[in-house]
């Protein structure tokens, strides 16, 4: 990439962000757009603009975000969202403190050396001699065996020590945040329940429920309340979903009748396009009556004949449930497996009956499948990354050369084509990875999202960071490697590939924070979709609410996306220190934009009380470890005699991770008894707690109950039953 293309990419991205921010300032002030820009507040019964200022100042939202407290985030979006901001602020602190030393130290050292000038072939440059302006500010301009490399080694130590400090501080803070939430005096159903799996077959003459009740009543005679046995609900769920669909269509038909005074009709065939013409209200009322009868029949069959070897067990106190969840109940570990119960809306009922050894086999099979997929997915990503450089693109498609030679087109293509191709490829992954995570037999939605996030992180690191880094170089040198496949040549290739990809990643990070966060803040696409649906499709208030329901922060993709930027910034922070400015901007702007969205827009679909943090902590350490290994290799490629001094840092990272896990992780895996023993505001309604876990498809439904509950309730109900 040429220097002009880089500036065009950066400038264009910034201009787009400014335009989107101005659009947000203008559009968010209009009352008709409130459901798009303030849905969180609306769903909580608050006035959209309460506590805010309707001003033309485009930076007013920043002031509101900066003045908000962590408790505000917890109150409006939950502990998990607050923990995500701890992650953003921790990484921002790491990069800001690192830059205080690295930028004033490393940039002058690199700029005043002359390695690039003295190297005729310039094989070590960032972009093969076409980007010398930034090459001179990178480690590529440092002469081999130079004493200046001591400063770069010191920078590796500084970044590592800063990271250890901030991670330790953050882990303590998140642990405290989780404990405070769990000590809340409010009654939460999941704190009075445990999840029991791998139950043995009941003795003759006992049902599964009688067996589990007698088992736990014997162990906990004073605190056991009752149990809810898991059932095979696939058929009853389908009937329930059809019934809900008919209720929705009936409500829609009644709304049309009220608005037009004409009774709506529809055809009974495929998609309402063919078949007999009928009165919609009478037709859907009849279908509802039929479905209710089918549902009641299937409910009786499910409760009598389809009980499974899993259950939710309830206790009269929080401390009894917390104690039971961490106790070994059977001498054989594959029987009576007990864990803390997730929230009712999180349970993946279809996974509860999967046995322990089956879960282990599934887990390792899916790990193997994901590893193979990562390797094969690297092929198209590396290929596309290689051919989307204009030089390689002209070699493969010669007839585009006249078009590419037009300066304006060439600049735009160089600025955005490779980065957009990469983003498109990564967008295909999240649903597949979430499906695979659920297939492991994981019992809760939040756990499945954490598992999918981990898989996505490794996809990103291997396919984006490593794949893109090597793609262009391999594309040009594959013949040389085939002729002379020596280890030293491959190591040299790895070392020299890093600086050559620095400008690609600078542009990639800029594209992510300017355009990505600009679209996030402005919500242009959700706004357009909402108004189109409202005008042409929605007939009932419930349909309008469904059209603007915002969803949550999408941790399964957001966390690994942030982790990729973290990894890139880490690994290039010493090689090309300018990337620290981009990393600081990404996480700083991300903190501001997401703070606004958390307080006003997104609605959490679950609460795990910060259980994502150990996953985040581990991935940050993995990125730091990769950075240290990369610097060990690159300093070695610079033939620096004291490269081995990086090894103690690598060992320290492993020890630090182990110590943190031993000290903090137990409080995230289980609820500490000193936390669970705190008093409640009022005595818990145990029957209400029990009923919270009953799948909605097993609740009673009457024909006249065809009203919609609203977007929030419907979304939670669907999660509780389908587990999706």
From Swiss-Prot:
Record annotation: effect of changing residue 619 to E: Induces a closed conformation
Cysteine-cysteine disulfides: none
UniProt keyword annotation of Transport present: yes
Chief place where the protein resides: membrane
Gene Ontology annotations for the cellular component aspect, listed alphabetically: chloroplast envelope; nucleus; plant-type vacuole; plasma membrane; plasmodesma
Domain of life of the source: Eukaryota
UniProt family annotation: Belongs to the CSC1 (TC 1.A.17) family.
The protein, known as: Hyperosmolality-gated Ca2+ permeable channel 3.1
Gene designation per UniProt: OSCA3.1
């Amino acid at each position: 990439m040429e220097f002009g293309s880089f500036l065009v990419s950066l400038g264009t991205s910034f201009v787009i962000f400014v335009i989107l921010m101005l659009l947000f300032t203008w559009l968010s002030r209009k009352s008709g757009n409130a459901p798009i820009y303030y849905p969180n507040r609306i769903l909580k019964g608050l006035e959209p603009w309460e506590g805010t200022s309707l001003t033309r100042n485009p930076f007013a939202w920043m002031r509101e975000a900066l003045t908000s407290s962590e408790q505000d985030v917890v109150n409006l979006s939950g502990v998990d969202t607050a923990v995500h901001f701890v992650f953003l602020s921790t990484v921002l602190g790491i990069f800001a403190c690192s830059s205080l030393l690295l930028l004033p130290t490393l940039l002058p050292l690199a700029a005043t050396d002359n390695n690039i000038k003295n190297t005729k072939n310039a094989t070590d440059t960032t972009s093969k001699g076409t980007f010398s302006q930034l090459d001179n500010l990178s480690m590529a301009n440092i002469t081999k065996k130079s004493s200046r490399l001591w400063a770069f080694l010191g920078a590796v130590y500084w970044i590592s020590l800063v990271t250890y400090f901030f991670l330790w501080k953050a882990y303590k803070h998140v642990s405290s945040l989780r404990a405070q939430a769990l000590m809340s005096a409010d009654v939460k159903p999941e704190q009075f329940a445990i999840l029991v799996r791998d139950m043995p077959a009941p003795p003759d003459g006992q049902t599964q429920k009688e067996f589990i009740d007698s088992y736990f009543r014997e162990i906990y005679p004073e605190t056991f309340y009752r149990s809810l046995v898991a059932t095979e609900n696939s058929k009853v769920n389908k009937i329930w979903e059809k019934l809900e669909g008919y209720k929705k269509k009936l409500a829609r038909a009644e709304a049309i009748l009220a608005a037009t005074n004409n009774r709506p009709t529809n055809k009974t065939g495929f998609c309402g396009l063919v078949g007999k013409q009928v009165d919609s209200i009478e037709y859907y009322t009849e279908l509802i009556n039929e479905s209710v009868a089918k549902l009641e029949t299937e409910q009786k069959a499910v409760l009598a004949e389809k009980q499974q070897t899993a259950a939710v067990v309830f206790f009269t106190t929080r401390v009894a449930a917390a104690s039971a969840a961490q106790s070994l109940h059977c001498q054989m570990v594959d029987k009576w497996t007990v864990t803390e119960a997730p929230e009712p809306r999180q349970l993946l009922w279809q996974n509860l009956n999967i046995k322990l050894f089956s879960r282990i086999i599934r887990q390792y099979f899916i790990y193997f499948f994901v590893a193979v997929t990562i390797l094969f997915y690297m092929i198209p990503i590396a290929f596309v990354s290689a051919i989307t450089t204009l030089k390689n693109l002209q070699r493969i498609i010669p007839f585009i050369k006249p078009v590419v030679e037009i300066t304006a087109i060439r600049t735009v293509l160089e600025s955005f084509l490779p980065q957009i191709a990469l983003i498109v490829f990564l967008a295909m992954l999240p649903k597949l990875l979430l499906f695979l995570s659920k297939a492991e037999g994981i019992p809760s939605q939040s756990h499945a999202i954490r598992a999918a996030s981990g898989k996505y992180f490794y996809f990103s690191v291997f396919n984006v960071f490593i794949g893109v880094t090597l793609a262009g170089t391999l594309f040009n040198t594959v013949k040389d490697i085939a002729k002379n496949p020596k280890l030293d040549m491959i190591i040299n290739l790895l070392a020299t590939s890093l600086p050559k990809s620095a400008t690609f990643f600078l542009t990639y990070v800029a594209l992510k924070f300017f355009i990505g966060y600009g679209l996030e803040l402005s919500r242009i696409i959700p706004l357009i979709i909402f108004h189109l649906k409202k005008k042409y499709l929605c007939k009932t208030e419930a349909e309008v609410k469904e059209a603007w329901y915002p969803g949550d922060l999408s941790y399964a993709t957001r966390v690994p996306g942030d982790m990729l930027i973290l990894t890139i910034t880490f690994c290039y922070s010493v090689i090309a220190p300018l990337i620290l400015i981009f990393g600081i901007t990404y996480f700083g702007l991300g903190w501001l934009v997401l703070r606004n969205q958390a307080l006003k827009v997104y609605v959490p679909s679950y609460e795990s009380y910060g259980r994502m943090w150990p996953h985040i902590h581990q991935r940050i350490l993995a990125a730091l470890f990769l950075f240290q290994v990369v610097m060990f290799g690159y300093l070695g490629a610079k033939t620096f005699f004291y490269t081995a001094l990086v090894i103690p840092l690598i060992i320290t990272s492993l020890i630090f991770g182990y110590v943190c896990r031993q000290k903090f992780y137990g409080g995230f895996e289980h609820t500490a008894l000193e936390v669970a023993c705190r008093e409640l505001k009022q005595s818990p309604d145990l029957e209400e707690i029990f009923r919270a876990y009953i799948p909605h498809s097993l609740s009673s439904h009457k024909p006249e109950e065809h009203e919609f509950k609203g977007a929030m309730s419907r979304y939670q109900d669907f999660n509780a039953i389908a587990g999706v």
